[in-house]
Amino acid sequence: MLSPRRTKFRKQQRGRMRGLAERGSTLNFGDYALQATEPCWITSRQIEAARRAMTRYIRRGGKIWIRIFPDKPVTMRPAETRMGSGKGSPEYWVAVVKPGRVMFELAGVSEEVAREAMRLAAQKLPIKTKFISRQEDYI
């Protein structure tokens, strides 16, 4: 699973997800891509599950690029802990995804194979997504 090797600070504030993705919204590497259509935090486990689903389907052919990286720590308090006594310890990592963000790219396979691989990956993610290709226009 993906996570940063080291960070400047152990804990982060939650922040807000407003507006569309300003960067990372165009196809850069592959011919087909999976684009987010709603905002969400995507965990490193979900990214890994989607990657596995795609690689199992396309087998040896094709190349996959993961365009999102979980760099935000999410903290949790232990169960049945009283209020106070500070912020919890980091439990897992998330990638902040805004609408329009390209999450996965794929090349070296036919459109039918790419469409099905992206569909399988999208089932592992908690958001609505859109399949885009170099031929089509996208947000």
Swiss-Prot record:
The keyword Ribonucleoprotein applies. Pfam families: Ribosomal_L16. InterPro entries: Ribosomal_uL16, Ribosomal_uL16_bact-type, Ribosomal_uL16_CS, Ribosomal_uL16_dom, Ribosomal_uL16_sf. One of its GO terms (cellular component) is cytosolic large ribosomal subunit. PROSITE patterns: RIBOSOMAL_L16_1 (PS00586), RIBOSOMAL_L16_2 (PS00701). It comes from the Bacteria. GO terms for biological process: translation. One of its GO terms (molecular function) is structural constituent of ribosome. Keywords: Ribonucleoprotein, Ribosomal protein, RNA-binding, rRNA-binding, tRNA-binding. Part of the 50S ribosomal subunit. Belongs to the universal ribosomal protein uL16 family. Binds 23S rRNA and is also seen to make contacts with the A and possibly P site tRNAs. PANTHER family: 50S/60S RIBOSOMAL PROTEIN L16, LARGE RIBOSOMAL SUBUNIT PROTEIN UL16M. This is Large ribosomal subunit protein uL16. The lineage of its organism: Bacteria, Bacillati, Cyanobacteriota, Cyanophyceae, Synechococcales.
